[in-house]
């Protein structure tokens, strides 16, 4: 099984476990999220590589952060680059790498994102999942829309936000890919 298939199965298992923990049927989760029952079922079985937008809706319905879907049990406080979970959004082709070891009890998650030129992704409010988030631009240019405000980030800029208050749109207006770090502080489950 390749990394993408393994990660799809991990994501599916996490969604299924989250749904079971809340004693939700597929129909109930579909109603909460606006994602079809059939799509949720296919994701849970690892048959579909869902987009960030779809996974974000499911996470909102489960009350968890997107990072929780990719987290692995901590085996060490050191997570080598070769072992970091990597996921590619099938819609926008952005690449998401979980940089920090998960399962350590830390409320902080660090994600590296490679965002293609011209790509755009809109995620809903993080509601009760994320307390705060920083986006630190390492390469390229990004526009981040939070509510009615558009923030243009250039090399080295860092944006602090509370994503529970409004949806977020990530857009790369440049001709080159952008790379940035996202530092999330998650609420305790």
Predicted features, each with a name:
Residues 13-30:
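Short basic helix-loop element that most often maps to the first helix and adjoining turn
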Residues 86-125, 132, 182-183:
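A short glycine-rich, His/Asp/Glu-containing loop-to-beta-strand
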